[in-house]
Every structure is written in structure tokens, then in C-alpha cells.
Amino acid sequence: MTNEELIAEAVKITREYINPQNVSIGHVGCALLSESGKLHLGVSIHANCDVGFCAEYGAVSSMLVTGEYKIKKIVAVHTGGTIFPPCGKCREFIYQIDASNLDTEVVLEKDKTLLLRELLPEMWQARPLK
């Protein structure tokens, strides 16, 4: 799947919805390709008391349900079509699911990707005290 096709899948699932409790649902959509080539999707939920989550969490959760852990390529897109790189929490989350995800291609533009390891040079890991 090309970057443009993956971006289009993420855009398809975004929506401008705010429920009566002022919770924003679906303003960001995420599409990822697992190692097997299967497409997984997720949307963001931003609640008032900070109990929501980024779209990447939804897409990764969808992948985990199928028994896969490795991500080949991922993109997150706002309703207006703007591509967002994963936030720091999502970068760490993707790495924590499987260390080989450091080689995940993160789509930053239609023609530009970086590996997760380039966006997360100092991932969390136990280090001995010196």
C-alpha cells in the first residue's frame, strides 16, 4: 500500500463529532499496516477529564486483537487532511508493543517517511545507575 493510499484510509474514518458532554470523537484517524499487510484503523477520543486516547492506540489495539504485534507502516491524519506524526506517548507505546517496531515507517508527508527509531532516539528502557 502506498503512502497516499494509507493516508486516504485514515482520512475516510475521521469525523468532526463532539458529543453533548463535549467529548471530541474521531478528529484524528490512524491507519497502519501490520507486518502481514493487513490494514488496521483507529480514531482519537479526547474527553474532558483526560481519559481519551490518540488514534494510534485504536489502530494498534485493532492489530493486537488479530494476534499481530509488528507494524510495517503507520499514519495519523486530522479531519482537515493534515498529517500528524505520533506524539511522544504514542511513539513509546508503539515501541513497547514490540521492539522491532523501531523499524516502523512513520508517514510524515505523501512522499516522506522516517523510521520510528529516528523519531524516538532515546526510548524508555531500564538502564543501570552509574
Predicted regions and their residues:
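Hydrophobic "anchor" residues
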Residues: 38-39
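A short glycine/serine-rich beta->alpha loop
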Residues: 42-50, 78-82
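C-terminal binding/interaction regions
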Residues: 1-20, 68-130
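Short, solvent-exposed cationic patches
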Residues: 55-75
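Conserved mixed alpha/beta catalytic, RNA-binding, or beta-rich assembly cores of soluble enzyme
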Residues: 27, 43-48, 55-58
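Short beta-strand scaffold segments in enzyme catalytic cores
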Residues: 24-34
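Short amphipathic alpha-helical face segments that pack within enzyme cores
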Residues: 54, 58, 89-92
